[in-house]
């Protein structure tokens, strides 16, 4: 999370926007405190609802650069329906989905992206569910911009952020 935070903080000035015209909306989970560390407007929303709240904000305030910060549990479990609809509507908002394949904030429950057989506190005999593939889900929802990167490659991460910011629609 901190590597992504540092990359986003370093990249934001490139947008050339006043900080009061940038908003970060988060849900619940490991990534949810993200807006507190940005020198912009932000909202820490309820579990799974960040895409819905951000959609409302982006459609009512087209002058804002709206970013969603969410995790695999928040976006692909309780918030899955909101994520899918945000992607298919192609509203001008940017979604950063942190996929650590575990509910880290609650000390290790398996998540929708955990591998089969993953032993956690909630699956002591190993998880039975096949994992979601977030990229396939986004493509299936007909998202107009889909990218994947890794936090340890700052150069690539920043390039993906740049391309997402330039994309007119959901990225």
What residue ranges belong to the model's regions?
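General beta-strand structural signal in soluble alpha/beta enzymes
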Residues: 23-26, 68, 95-98, 146-150
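Active-site diphosphate/adenylate-binding microenvironment
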Residues: 1-47
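Active-site-proximal loop->helix
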Residues: 80-85, 105-118, 137
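Core alpha/beta catalytic barrel or barrel-like domain that forms the active/cofactor pocket
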Residues: 22-29, 33, 103-106, 131, ...
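Conserved active-site and cofactor/substrate-binding residues in soluble primary-metabolism enzymes
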Residues: 2-7, 19, 48, 52, ...
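Generic secondary-structure signature for well-ordered alpha-helical cores
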Residues: 1-4, 10-17, 59-62, 88-91, ...
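Conserved thiamine diphosphate
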Residues: 112-167
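Thiamine diphosphate
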Residues: 30-104, 156-159
């Amino acid at each position: 999370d901190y590597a992504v935070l540092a990359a986003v903080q370093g990249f934001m000035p490139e947008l050339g926007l006043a900080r009061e015209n940038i908003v970060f909306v988060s849900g619940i989970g490991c990534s949810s405190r993200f807006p507190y560390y940005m020198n912009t407007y932000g909202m820490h929303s309820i579990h799974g609802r960040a895409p819905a709240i951000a959609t409302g904000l982006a459609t009512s305030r087209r002058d804002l650069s709206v970013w969603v910060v969410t995790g695999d549990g928040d976006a692909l479990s309780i918030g899955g329906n909101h994520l899918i609809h945000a992607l298919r509507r192609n509203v001008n908002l940017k979604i950063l989905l942190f996929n650590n394949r575990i509910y880290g904030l609650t000390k290790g429950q398996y998540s929708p992206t955990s591998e089969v057989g993953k032993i956690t506190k909630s699956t002591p005999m190993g998880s039975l569910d096949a994992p979601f593939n977030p990229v396939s889900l986004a493509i299936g929802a007909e998202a107009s911009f889909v990218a994947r990167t890794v936090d340890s490659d700052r150069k690539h991460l920043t390039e993906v952020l740049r391309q997402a910011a330039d994309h007119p629609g959901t990225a």
